């Protein structure tokens, strides 16, 4: 009988587990993740109510952490009361980062000036609370790069696909580059190669239920698929999957903290 090789341990650094897409089978989704060697999932908040839901999920189960923030699509909802409500969530031990925040000039679901105000406010909140911040950047490279200059806390560039301007700004502040299922897409054009990113600044994520990786394209994404992202990133960098998986898990623990020692 041959030797059984254990699956590498994995961390899904960005998942919208509170999304209604998971309401019918959330427990089964997490069990599949556990069976696929996913040891921890970071559950992302995108609005105040979504952040509350993410925190509740993380507080109720092992192997889950949460973030709290307002997505650029929802920046128009930012009000004078928002910072205090986010602060209350960020005081919870299961809430490990600010975000998802940032700028999205592709869809412009919120006015750009509102996006910038909300992003700046959340960067300031992260600095005040000494929390890492999860950043969404799409078609807004110059403004994102400018606003990231000098940020004193760890920055995660989620689903990284930006060009050299954001890459160089991220490098200057020691940001983490988190790769999603997009790295598996056949026709995706990368302007910054995954091999350009420092090994100690790599993360992997699903962004579930969105961006299902090959060979799961067309399906609802879920944390158990993060292994496909790890495999693609390892191939792109010419590394062994086991080494890449262990390194990205260690990196996630470094940026998000000891909460990630809790496992599914």
Map each language-model feature to its residues.
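Mid-domain alpha/beta scaffold segments of enzyme catalytic cores
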Residues: 1-264
